[in-house]
Amino acid sequence: MSTVANPNYKKGFVPFAIAALLVSLIGGFTAVLGPAFVADQGIDYNNTTWISLALAMSSAACAPILGKLGDVLGRRTTLLLGIVIFAAGNVLTAVATSLIFMLAARFIVGIGTAAISPIVMAYIVTEYPQEETGKAFGLYMLISSGAVVVGPTCGGLIMNAAGWRVMMWVCVALCVVVFLICTFSIKKTAFEKKSMAGFDKPGAALVVVFFSLFLCIPSFGQNIGWSSTAFIAAAAVALVALFILVMVEKKAKSPIMNGKFMARKEFVLPVLILFLTQGLMMANMTNVIVFVRYTQPDNVIISSFAISIMYIGMSLGSVIIGPVADKKEPKTVLTFSLVLTAIGCALMYLFKADSSVAIFAASLGILGFGLGGNATIFMKVALSGLSSEVAGSGTGTYGLFRDISAPFGVAVFVPMFANGVTANIAKYASGGMEEGAATVKAAISSIQTLTLVELGCIVVGIILVRMLPRIYQKKEA
């Protein structure tokens, strides 16, 4: 991999790190937004899935596009543009008055996120010496996960004291501060802007269409019906979009999706495992919040503290487990971290109506610790060998699959839990059980079923990890 000789690369990384801090901190603040909004609007809790997916669709699908744009316009311009869009989305979130309005606002927030994250990773790939990129990605993961440690707790406290709209205006103020910092601290360079004439616009449009539908399809199936017209139509459009996307990208001179980069084993295998396991974090975070809403409706803070513990675990996993893979075989380290992930999920089976913050925190904390280690290792492996010319599109492509794995988990596991609760409430109520008792029993039964399904996914993930090639030894040979 070629790197740029920059003696001030660590100092130059500071504003990019602050931008990453902004995204993760506000992500933590808004972890409690979905359930609060649907409760405020008086609509079903399963609508939290759509709020999460709206942001996830744009942040994932637009990542390779805006990463590619960074290769064309330059990092500084793209980063500042991303912060502006990110701030605008949060302003719209603060004034949202309906579900449709909120979905549009979160979609815009996701576009801003998609412009910021690939640029930060591209800086690491191109400016840091090759022998220090592992530590740099560990630092990036620490910033990304560590910042949201205080986010859910602070967000919950602000929301409890003043409401979710005030919480969002605090987020907007943070965006303004970070924009000013980045504007004055990132120096204009001699970067030569490339012409937009050869920009892969058809590929960009098809990427958004396919991957947005890819995220929505599981929710369509579970909420509307697997044999419904909407599900069949969405699946058909997605397949057609995928076929056309492959054809377009094969012919494009400068494709959004770099086929050579994606075809490597170092990319394919980690992505498959990410889809099986990494989505558990966001899904379980949402499900714990909803579980507490069902079983302890007057307790706003308990789930926020538990989520903060999860991000502490993720931060520790990224800096403790992740770097171990530089010395030991990655698949051995990954197996260990996935076992920890399984333990975290298994603890959900013990959730009860009167469970304390301790068991919620233990479950999410251990889960975060295991997944934090995985994420760091996968990032170092998948992004190896990128040249500076395609750093933006490469990191954006990886970011697409990394980011889409989490909301894909949300699209599968959150409706599975929420719809399970709804079905069980109806079943227990029809048997003569009082509504409150039926709701609590339904939530416990559904979380236990969900636990068994998630453990099955982790087992498959471990099997795939054991099939990984001896990655680092192979590179040394």
From Swiss-Prot:
How does this chain sit within the bilayer?
Multi-pass membrane protein
Q: Which GO terms describe its biological process?
A: bile acid and bile salt transport; bile acid catabolic process; lipid catabolic process
Kindly give the CDD domains that the UniProt entry links to this protein.
MFS_MMR_MDR_like
Instruction: Tell me, in one coarse class, where this protein mainly resides.
Output: membrane
Where do the TM regions start and end?
13-33, 50-70, 83-103, 107-127, 139-159, 166-186, 206-226, 228-248, 272-292, 301-321, 333-353, 359-379, 381-401, 406-426, 444-464
- Listed InterPro entries: MFS (IPR011701), MFS_dom (IPR020846), MFS_trans_sf (IPR036259)
Alphabetic keyword roster: Bile acid catabolism, Cell membrane, Lipid degradation, Lipid metabolism, Membrane, Steroid metabolism, Transmembrane, Transmembrane helix, Transport
Q: Name one GO molecular function term.
A: bile acid transmembrane transporter activity
Superkingdom, taxonomy of origin: Bacteria
Offer a single GO CC term for the protein.
membrane
Kindly give the PROSITE patterns that the UniProt entry links to this protein: MFS (PS50850)
Has the keyword Magnesium been applied to this entry?
Answer: no
Recorded metabolic or biological pathway in which this protein acts: Lipid metabolism; bile acid degradation
Which locations, inside or outside the cell, does it occupy? Answer: Cell membrane
The entry sums up its family as follows:
Belongs to the major facilitator superfamily.
Q: What is this protein called?
A: Bile acid transporter
Q: Which organism is it from?
A: Clostridium scindens (strain JCM 10418 / VPI 12708)
Name of the gene: baiG
